[in-house]
């Protein structure tokens, strides 16, 4: 990833903040807290003031306009430390949906609170057990909003929800509603990696409590947001995989068996080289996808799927190999290696597994 001087300086600043305030130990602390706790809200406010929430936002709207490569670099820093933040749920998905799907008046009204960290939002769009973004049954009926949504990331911490729903004409729509509105029931749970998700049930939520997102083309805007979220998640996975690879190589240099460093064993050298080559291949795909979002005339769907599919495979390979190369202690909770492995399994399913992205990539290329 090649960043300009401003982007690199920003990445370094965020990395230093995360190392000091949100190291891997923060994830361990989170696991012991009530399930309603998704992340440290105060620390997220500090990250927002640092500029993390405004990286891709145009300067005219109060953003830094650093571009998607810069946001990808920040996501990699978060991935290196497994830092629990609402970057994906609130910034990329919710804030992105507001910017690309809403009217200028709605953007002007709601965006400032998201940029400065005063509010965090979540998007409720998944209704199936597996990623199926095109399936939609939640609808605005004469009685109100009715339906259910599962796997809403960081949903219990959200001040507002953006909900995909069919309007009374049966057309796709996106509406905004306060998370504590009567008729909204939620069940928070933790995933195997310690992160929070919420299943929401909407039972005749009054239409007067909801606000339809009124941009000129909200459905196509939401499709772009999903592609961007896939690439940013892939960047986070890449950061985790790179950290894991570096830790494992250091272990190979230090661990001794039969009075020699195990890194001198040719079989382990070949496996380490394989990890590194897959890491660089994934890096190239992620960079290409991020650059595509700042470009015209590029198939962003194909690039996002290539990045996510390769990140899935890379992170799973490196997490598996890291556990094996650490031996018996690799499966213990005391070692951070297992936390990365659990994160790899969760990320593999988020926003489409490898098979889903292989199919979409092939379809985009006409196969």
Q: What are these regions, as identified by a protein language model?
A:
Residues 1-80, 101-104, 113, 117, ...:
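Alpha-helical interface subdomain recognition
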Residues 51, 75-78, 177-181, 206:
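Short Ser/Thr-interspersed hydrophobic loop/turn segments at strand-loop and sheet-helix junctions
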Residues 66, 132-135, 154-158:
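Short glycine/proline-enriched turns and hinge-like loops at secondary-structure junctions
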Residues 83-105:
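N-terminal glycine-rich flavin-associated loop
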Residues 116-128:
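A short, Trp-centered hydrophobic/proline-enriched beta-strand micro-motif
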Residues 124, 148-184:
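A short core secondary-structure module
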Residues 138-140:
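A structural signal for short hydrophobic beta-strand segments in well-ordered beta-sheet cores
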Residues 192-218, 367:
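Internal glycine-rich alpha/beta core junctions
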């Amino acid at each position: 990833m090649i960043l300009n001087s401003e982007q690199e300086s920003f990445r370094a600043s965020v990395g230093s903040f995360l190392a000091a305030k949100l190291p891997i130990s923060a994830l361990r602390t989170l696991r012991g807290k009530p399930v309603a706790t998704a992340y440290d809200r105060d620390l997220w406010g500090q990250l927002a003031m640092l500029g993390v929430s405004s990286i891709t936002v145009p300067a005219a709207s109060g953003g830094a306009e650093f571009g998607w490569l810069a946001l990808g670099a920040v996501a990699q820093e978060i991935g290196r430390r497994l830092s629990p933040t609402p970057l994906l749920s609130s910034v990329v998905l919710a804030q992105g949906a507001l910017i690309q799907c809403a009217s200028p008046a709605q953007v002007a009204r709601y965006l400032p609170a998201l940029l400065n960290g005063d509010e965090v939002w979540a998007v409720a769009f998944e209704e199936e057990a597996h990623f199926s973004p095109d399936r939609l049954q939640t609808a605005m009926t004469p009685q109100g909003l009715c339906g259910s949504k599962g796997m809403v990331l960081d949903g219990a911490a959200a001040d507002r929800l953006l909900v995909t729903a069919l309007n009374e004409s049966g057309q796709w729509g996106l509406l905004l509603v306060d998370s504590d509105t009567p008729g909204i029931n939620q069940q928070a749970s933790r995933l195997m990696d310690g992160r929070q998700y919420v299943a929401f049930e909407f039972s005749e939520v009054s239409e007067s409590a909801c606000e339809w997102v009124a941009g000129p083309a909200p459905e196509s805007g939401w499709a772009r947001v999903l592609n961007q979220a896939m690439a940013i998640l892939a960047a986070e996975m890449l950061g985790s995989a790179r950290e894991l690879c570096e830790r494992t190589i250091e272990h190979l240099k230090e661990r001794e068996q039969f009075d020699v460093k195990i890194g001198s064993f040719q079989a382990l050298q070949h496996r380490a080289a394989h990890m590194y080559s897959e890491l660089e291949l994934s890096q190239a795909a992620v960079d290409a996808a991020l650059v595509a979002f700042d470009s015209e005339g590029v198939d962003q769907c194909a690039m996002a799927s290539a990045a996510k599919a390769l990140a899935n495979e890379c992170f799973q390979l490196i997490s598996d190999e890291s556990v094996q190369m650490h031996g018996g202690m690799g499966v213990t909770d005391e070692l951070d290696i297992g936390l990365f492995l659990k994160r790899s399994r969760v990320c593999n399913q988020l926003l489409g597994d490898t098979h889903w992205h292989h199919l979409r990539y092939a379809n985009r290329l006409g196969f």
